């Protein structure tokens, strides 16, 4: 159900619940705007171990679930923003990112930040189109 402002709050148990006063995503008439995801396991709410590669994989899996719950998907992503704690992790993050976006890659910005929630090494948010074949 859409609010009077024309937006729909998106929430799924397949991705980590919000750790602050924000929504996992907001859906408008044609777009989905996700909150930043870090590499939290949604079942435990713990950060996955092993460095930036497994965290990036978990982040993108979380985003996939959020987008799918909004009648979208990774193939409809038009823009991502990647936040890295250390730009030295860029090649490892990038190799995992390429697995999730093998073709028709979205526009992307990548920035280094001083710190991320829960001590994460990577956070990603995105903007996506709705699936034109959705069933609303």
Kindly give the residue locations of the regions a language model identified.
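Short, polar/acidic, helix-capping and beta-turn segments at strand->helix junctions
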Residues: 2-136
